[in-house]
UniProtKB/Swiss-Prot annotation:
PANTHER family, per database record: PROTEIN PREY, MITOCHONDRIAL (PTHR33505:SF4), ZGC:162634 (PTHR33505)
Name recorded for this polypeptide: UPF0434 protein PSEEN1604
Leader sequence residues: none
One term under GO cellular component: cytosol
Sequence similarity: Belongs to the UPF0434 family.
Record lineage: Bacteria, Pseudomonadati, Pseudomonadota, Gammaproteobacteria, Pseudomonadales
Database matches in Gene3D superfamilies: 2.20.25.10
Top-level division of the source organism's lineage: Bacteria
Length: 61
């Protein structure tokens, strides 16, 4: 994932920042409690495609 792209992307729900997951397969929105998948290098920023974060993931800094 291009870091320049990550800098300009925002969560479509909260308009807050996104963080790249450790395995670089998801964009994490702590504010919305969602993880948006990255498929073939393209972030899928649809709420219907996002996964809900676990309680542990929500607390992880």
């Amino acid at each position: 994932m291009d870091t320049k792209l990550l800098d300009i992307l925002a969560c479509p729900i909260t308009k807050g920042p996104l963080k790249l997951s450790a395995d670089k397969t998801e964009l994490i929105s702590k504010g919305a409690g969602l993880a948006y998948p990255i498929r073939d290098g393209i972030p899928v920023m649809l709420e219907s495609e996002a996964r809900t974060l676990t309680d542990e993931e929500r607390l992880d800094k």
